[in-house]
Amino acid sequence: MNNASRRASASFLEGVRTRGVLLLMPSAKASLDDSAYWSWCLAAGFQEIGVPVFSNESSSFASRGITVAAAPEMIHDDTMVIGDISAIESCNSECVTLARRVFERARRSALLCMSDVVSSVDFPDTAPVFVAHSNSRIFARGRRIPWAFGLSREVMDKIAGAHRLQVRERLFLRNFRPSGNQSVRNALDLSFVKRLADKMAIDTSFDNHGRWNSDYFDRLGGSLGCLAYGGHFVEDFFRREEFRSQIGERRILSDEPAIDRWDSWRFWESLASGCVTVALDFDEYGLQIPVKPVNGVHYVGLRLDRLEDAVALLSGPQTPLAVIAENGREWVTTHYAPAPVAHLFLETMERLEESQ
């Protein structure tokens, strides 16, 4: 199937438009932070394609400029129910209760989880779970559907309103804030970034204004490229005999270290801003999303054993880089803007229903 045409059937879409989608999440206190990002993206996308949206926490959506109706007292059997448990680390008991509600309903229901720890969480097989950071080399139980951070309507509006230079500065942004469990960034600082800095200007400054501030999008709009990788290395402890009884089963399906927690907002924002986006090679490291970009066409993918190739490309002639940047911008807005993501979600749900 052509990825650009991944949409639910007309009859399925009409049914969802008739009964709507109920987005459930933990308390408003927990859902006002960015853990509700996927719910915001889906709500905006559903509304753009004519699907009514309800929620038990409408204040979370209002905080991002999205108006949704309050959850009805009675939920029709044909209403699609989506539970967002991305805040599982900060409100575990609420998320467990919410997940049980979805699993008990089973029909036309699903969970969302973009938590940093989702790759280590096992789920029942009752309902599908759309998960971030999916890696073919990391095993966890459940009906797991690889999903991507993607673009919110708010982010797209801020990118559209950002100041853009007619000629971008020939530099790369490396603006990661220090944080835990980012061993991939640390390793590449010691190897790739040092090599690239010998040939290209790199802006390593970062701000402390929080996520999605206008200054950041202005910087993206004026820069040639952005380093947008992330994640941490995990290895197979099951290979060590004394750990096997504690682990129970093999979780890392590779003799080499795998990469977890690899997705980031920066990757999507960089692509949509028209930057040359530098990330890990999706195919080389088993990174999974519904529609994958092509290395060298939509982004520049790093292989840790071939960093010199990436340095040569990024420090070379600007015309090929400009083509990659424009291809990446077109790819991300085609597949990962709110409306395409909403269509893709419904197509996936219909396909899962048909397979049962």
Please place each PLM-identified region on the residue numbering.
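Long alpha-helical, hydrophobic tracts
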Residues: 274, 314-315
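A charged, aromatic-enriched C-terminal amphipathic alpha-helix characteristic of glycosyltransferases
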Residues: 319-350
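Amphipathic alpha-helical segments within well-ordered protein domains
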Residues: 311-312, 329
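Membrane-proximal bilayer-interacting regions
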Residues: 309, 315, 339-341
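Hydrophobic, well-ordered secondary-structure elements that form the walls
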Residues: 270, 299, 328
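Short, hydrophobic alpha-helical segments
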Residues: 315, 348-356
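Nucleotide-sugar donor-binding catalytic core of glycosyltransferases
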Residues: 3-295, 352
